């Protein structure tokens, strides 16, 4: 009778629930670990027949190379984290895609998370990503104190802030010209005859909201217009709050004839309120929005290039990771006024 192979001579199989290892592949193919390593890493020195046997074992076992272990030996994880403010905000879609495209071009994986506009959640998420040894962070900040990141930055975690600057630390920041864009948008309304112009924006502690309000005030001052408190409203962007603000501006003793909306979430509610009015009210919105050109009239906007912001931030991040000695820089990208009709309506009275 043929001799029964000893247990140790039999090809081993991975235990249920465990990922197959190179040792499992070597046992199944009847070769050494070094041979499997050469095949997996595309190295020379393996005959075609041996390579075929190793590849068959890989396919049969479902083996996948452990890239995490490989990159950790090199001191990198080939991963970067992106901390967004609000995943539901359409502004962050093209921004996130642009960051991911740059990361992919550098062979890195992008890990997304949302702070939900909560500073504590932002800190928790950023530090959790650092604990998982991401090589770098791109952060849209919800808070205004980022000293908690100092130890991580000193440890070599590349960091770039987007849309708003960091607080309490010197770090790269890529953002739009919020002040200049708002100033241009309000000046556009003034140029079409408006003197009573309302401003509805996000919470004042948010950098973009305060800068856009500053642009509004400056444009009104440039035109010699004294702004009434009733014309300005900053706060949460939930529809109920924005609706109340818009209705009060439109029905008060000195009703506005035009509205400048501070972001696309505000704009959606403002459009609904204006559609219910018996008179036509001009509108310029900060941030473009989908289907804005299909409304009647089309919505005049101050457009940001979210993809360019994300791409610039990611390029900056990988330059840091590649060892470039860069001083922290604030990079402001220009906005663009797109006239579609709503911002060109004359005053109704």
Positions of the model-derived regions?
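N-terminal helix-turn-helix DNA-binding module of bacterial transcription factors
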Residues: 1-78, 347
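Bacterial carbohydrate/catabolite-sensing allosteric modules
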Residues: 1-15, 60, 101-106, 154-161, ...
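Short beta-strand segments enriched in small/hydrophobic residues
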Residues: 28, 33-38, 72-88, 188, ...
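Amphipathic helical "hinge" segments at domain boundaries
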Residues: 63-128, 132-136, 217, 221
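Short hydrophobic/charged patches on amphipathic alpha-helices used for structural packing
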Residues: 69, 123-126, 149, 186, ...
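Structural motif
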Residues: 83, 138, 258-260
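Short beta->alpha connector loops
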Residues: 116-119, 140-145, 264-265
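Acidic, Gly/Pro-rich loop/turn segments at junctions of secondary structure
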Residues: 136-149, 161-170
